Structure formats: C-alpha cells, structure tokens
Amino acid sequence: MEQSEEGQQQQQQGVMDYVPPHAYQSGPVNAASHMAFQQAHHFHHHHQQQQQQQLQMFWANQMQEIEHTTDFKNHTLPLARIKKIMKADEDVRMISAEAPVIFAKACEMFILELTLRAWIHTEENKRRTLQKNDIAAAISRTDVFDFLVDIIPRDELKEEGLGVTKGTIPSVVGSPPYYYLQQQGMMQHWPQEQHPDES
C-alpha cells in the first residue's frame, strides 16, 4: 500500500516538476528572445509616450483656442440643432443664448478627442482609413468614454484584437486631466483617476 502511494506521489511530482527542455536554455537563443522582448517593450513604451504627447498637445491647443476665442458667432456645429436636442428634455423650459454656444464647443471637443484616439488605433493597425472599430477601440480604452460602451456593437469590439480591455492596457502617468476647477485665475488639474471631491 505504501509503495502505491509513493508511486502516485512520484507520478504527481513528476508531472508538476516537468519543465520543457528549452525553458532554461542559455546562450544565443534565450539572449536573442530576451533582446527581442526588450526591444518590443521599449518600442511599445515609446509609442505610448508619443500617443500621450499627442493627447497633451491636443488639449493644450484646445485650451489655447478657447482662451483666445473672440468670435462667438461662427460655430462648427449648428446651434439650432443643439438647442432642439436640449429642449428634448421636458424639464428644460428656457435656454439662454450662451448655453448652445458652450454645448457646441463641448461637442466639437468631444468629437475631436474621440477622433484623435480612434486615429491612434488606426495607425497602430497600419491603416490610413479610420473605421468604426477604431472608434470602438478608442471608447473601450478610455475611462471617460465608458458611457458609450453600451452603444458599441459587440462585434466591433471583437475585430482586430479589440478583446484587449482597458484593464489590461497599462495606464500612462500624466494622462490628460478631465476635472478642472477655476480658482483665482489659475487652472488646477486633477489626474483622471482622482476627483477633486476625493482629495
């Protein structure tokens, strides 16, 4: 009886201790694969930094454009349509003249950022045409676009390796903040993960 138990333990231990013959190879093969991994990691990190710089430049340009805007009569989006959408809410009785202007600019900035993030995905896939799955990828990778996840068709998320969720994508330190507080003529920024009410 003891021999059969010992035999089973040895078999189990043998299965658990099995290591493929090439797992601990040293020399050129292992060094080459390690070097390739390091290069791929370095490229990925560098690519992420470039994307982050693009987004930071985008927001810096948007802030500068807002600060220097003097013509509030020309808009890229139709104010009448925005006002009509605002009035779709039954609780809204009256709308000031400034409200649609602010909504127009906010919508423009929303579209521009989503387009930039989708274009980044397009370039990652070495294409020159932005597709709807690029927009789906931009939405699924960005926390502030979570409210749009339910309107993305599920098949769009499966195309071109979009099974990667934002949980598996490393966050880049210094991502553009989305919470602003105007105080004494200065702009304060909080990181995307931290809200001013949480400090």
Swiss-Prot record:
Belongs to the NFYC/HAP5 subunit family. CDD domains: HFD_NFYC-like (cd22908). It comes from Arabidopsis thaliana. It holds the Pfam family Histone. This is Nuclear transcription factor Y subunit C-2. Its main location: nucleus. GO terms for cellular component: CCAAT-binding factor complex; cytoplasm; nucleus. Keywords: Activator, Cytoplasm, DNA-binding, Nucleus, Transcription, Transcription regulation. Signal peptide: none annotated. It is found in: Nucleus; Cytoplasm. The gene is NFYC2. Ubiquitous. It comes from the Eukaryota. GO terms for molecular function: DNA-binding transcription factor activity; protein heterodimerization activity; transcription cis-regulatory region binding. GO terms for biological process: positive regulation of DNA-templated transcription; regulation of DNA-templated transcription. Heterotrimeric transcription factor composed of three components, NF-YA, NF-YB and NF-YC. NF-YB and NF-YC must interact and dimerize for NF-YA association and DNA binding. Interacts with HTT1 in both cytoplasm and nucleus. InterPro entries: Histone-fold, Histone_H2A/H2B/H3, Transcr_DNA_Rep_Reg. Stimulates the transcription of various genes by recognizing and binding to a CCAAT motif in promoters.
